[in-house]
Amino acid sequence: MPSLNDVRSTFLNYFERNGHRVVESSPLVPRNDPTLMFTNSGMVQFKNLFTGVETRDYKRATTAQKCVRAGGKHNDLDNVGYTARHHTFFEMLGNFSFGDYFKDGAIPFAWELLTKDFGIPKDKLLVTVYHTDDEAADIWKKVAGLSDDRIIRIPTSDNFWQMGPTGPCGPCTEIFYDHGEQIWGGPPGSADEDGDRFIEIWNLVFMQNEQFEDGTMRALDMQSIDTGMGLERIGALLQGKHDNYDTDLMRGLIEASAHATSADPDGPGKVHHRVIADHLRSTSFLIADGVMPSNEGRGYVLRRIMRRAMRHAHMLGAKDPVMHRLVPALVREMGAAYPELGRAQALIEETLKLEETRFKQTLDRGLRLLDDELAKLPEGANLPGEAAFKLYDTYGFPLDLTQDALREKGRAVDTAGFDSAMAEQKAKARAAWAGSGETKDAAIWFDIAEEHGATEFLGYDTEISEGQVLALVQDGAAVEEAGEGQQVQIVVNQTPFYGEAGGQVGDTGLIKTETGAARVTDTKKTGGVFIHIAEVTLGTIQRGQGAQLSVDHDRRSAIRANHSATHLLHEALRRALGEHVAQRGSLNAPDRLRFDFSHAKAMTPEELAQVEREVNDFIRQNSPVETRIMTPDDARALGAQALFGEKYGDEVRVVSMGELPGSGKGTGGQTYSLELCGGTHVARTGDIGMFALTSETASAAGIRRIEALTGQAAMDELRRVDGELNEIAGIVKAQAGDVVSKVRALADERKALANEVAQLKRQLAMGGGSEDKPREINGIKLIARRVEGVSGKELGPLVDEMKSRLGSGAVVVLAEADGKATVAAGVTPDLTGRISAVELVQTATAALGGKGGGGRPDRAQGGAPSLAAADSAISAVETLIGEKA
């Protein structure tokens, strides 16, 4: 019986033998399609090849693509654990042709792999084709010998695939497996097609047409193939299982869950184990690909998946965090096929543990609230939407988590009521995913790229070059010239200006032609085209002219220093904190650098000092910064760090700097920092000058941010700090080295004096320690007085002390300090039945022109504009007491 790992290898090896390039899975966060939340099929990474925007050095490819469907259009979350074939994470096996073979190649490949390599009996297979696709039907008859009744023609969109409203499209053929008459269900296209007897195992898409906005369609110049087969589904079939969760890989994770929770894997908690096994995969792979739990976008979907799994662990009786303990089992099962799991294992475990620890208390409270709400309802009644929203709004429970909990109780949620309460949040979420709205601008840059090709970048070797103005763009439209004072975007055939990418800001400088000059204020890059954002400062700039381009040297030098420093910083962080550290963002500007990295907690002062010291050690080493061009595979083999989320071509630049002890030339030692990077760098580490950390803060959940300075900016910062230190030393009359101890002593002294002052204020307010002489009104002793310099915070203890001395009676104190007037009152316990301190305060503040005041019957406090009418306020209090029986 083949394992799922065997099935994956068999698939990839088969197509590799048949001339296909084995391409590694792309990340779960799509690189080239902002409309997708997660990669959900094998063709996503090849989209630009199918549309002709991009070309590569192969025309046949095969992949095992990791996919997530949870959120957005493709959302399997609610059904996971309850059905045999729903998953949030799955692997899509696929083979692809980009203008190479077509139907007559794809169908024979599929049939041979299924019936020979996988050994599936031919009589167990049947297919569907689009109802007008006679070509595919004829090939199936010829290659597989299928009779007409086993080639089912489908007239619906189930067998016609479209990339979108416009673009490549075409018919498809789907291959089904017949589980036999003992399983209920009918063939595709029949009334009983939703049964489980006939299961789709492979879909072959024939991209042969292009759809236009007006509904017309034409044949594509380049016909392509896109196929997809779920590994879990074909693996279950080959292992003789009817349920994906019974396959070896999923069973291993289920048993790990059972061991961690001490719960029978096949007992009453079976569904819980299935949910945990599935969600462990999706959460771990998402974290490995750089997604961290948050309250918006992809991070929010990740958090929902994590919390759903954690609730099911809770239902199994788990009292402590469980999910992080299952990660080693996942790495054992899938780490060989996906090495990123092993590299990110520590980060995955720590993230899961922190999230589960935080959510545990929320979960307990929320489930108690849910039980309380259900107890109020008639037997079997659905939960009101307002209650479900309260769970979400107050306790962080997504709707699907509430629905999942209710599902086990045979209940549901009034979703209409919930939707009404959530309308505003959903509107914001839809707006966030609606797209950038830059279609017009994107079209012009696409046209320029089509006409002129990519801009050649010369900036690695020079800051000055000549070029030709290929295009001028204003307000999203091409123009022939731009005049003095106008803003314009300039495209040239070659440039020394670096276009913003990889955290490095774009260059600034000058572009001159024979008729004018323009000041470049920024440089961007899109689709290989460098866009110089400029203002014409002299004459005119015209399309087709020759141009002299010069980068601002001083600014570029500062950017280079900061960018090289981030490489040293990245490696220093990995060595100080662990290999889970990975870059999650950066800013390399001329005046500062910022570096975001994966780490779940704040760095200690000792760790920060270690990192800063190590970076400066390698700056002082003054080792050469070297750049080599190689394939991505060769770079990874050398151990080069890749920038998260960056798309790399067939060749990459690998930047190395720093030499570990004993690694000088000819000694066979190791390079300190080795990264894939397209940015510009210093020639030697010593050119950075020096490095000074200025802050370390949280950037997002599980993401820390370091800000730092280099070179002259770092020196200026140290001088500023040193100057302030010397100034403080002069003020406190101490040597610079003794400032800390001196300031600490002064702080202690100030605290002691403040306590003395507070005590003296209380004594003064009480008459300098002499016995207070209360006035008796209606049998109630009253002390009412005005005091100065006593703050509202100090009034409470003062009133309590005066009450204590009084024994029985009431106290009213009017105080003014720092421009704020406050009234405080107290009543001894034996009199609170006759008069309340709240009444006294409200009466006094009203006389002072204020409103309200509150507290307890024995002590209350309120504010007033001023004490100008203090005498009237005291009289009002006396009158109130006189009226009390």
Swiss-Prot record:
* GO-annotated molecular function: alanine-tRNA ligase activity; aminoacyl-tRNA deacylase activity; ATP binding; tRNA binding; zinc ion binding
Name the domain of life: Bacteria
Q: State where Zn(2+) binds.
A: 563, 567, 677, 681
Q: Where is the signal peptide?
A: none
- What biological-process terms (Gene Ontology) are attached? alanyl-tRNA aminoacylation; negative regulation of DNA-templated transcription
Provide GO CC annotations from the record: cytosol
EC number from the UniProt entry = 6.1.1.7
Q: What Pfam families does the record tag this protein with?
A: DHHA1, tRNA-synt_2c, tRNA_SAD
Region (Disordered), start-end ranges: 848-868
Q: Which UniProt keywords apply?
A: Aminoacyl-tRNA synthetase, ATP-binding, Cytoplasm, Ligase, Metal-binding, Nucleotide-binding, Protein biosynthesis, RNA-binding, tRNA-binding, Zinc
Write down the chemical reaction(s) this protein catalyses.
tRNA(Ala) + L-alanine + ATP = L-alanyl-tRNA(Ala) + AMP + diphosphate
Q: Which SMART domains match?
A: tRNA_SAD
EC primary class:
ligase
Q: Domain comment?
A: Consists of three domains; the N-terminal catalytic domain, the editing domain and the C-terminal C-Ala domain. The editing domain removes incorrectly charged amino acids, while the C-Ala domain, along with tRNA(Ala), serves as a bridge to cooperatively bring together the editing and aminoacylation centers thus stimulating deacylation of misacylated tRNAs.
Q: What is this protein called?
A: Alanine--tRNA ligase
Annotated source species: Paracoccus denitrificans (strain Pd 1222)
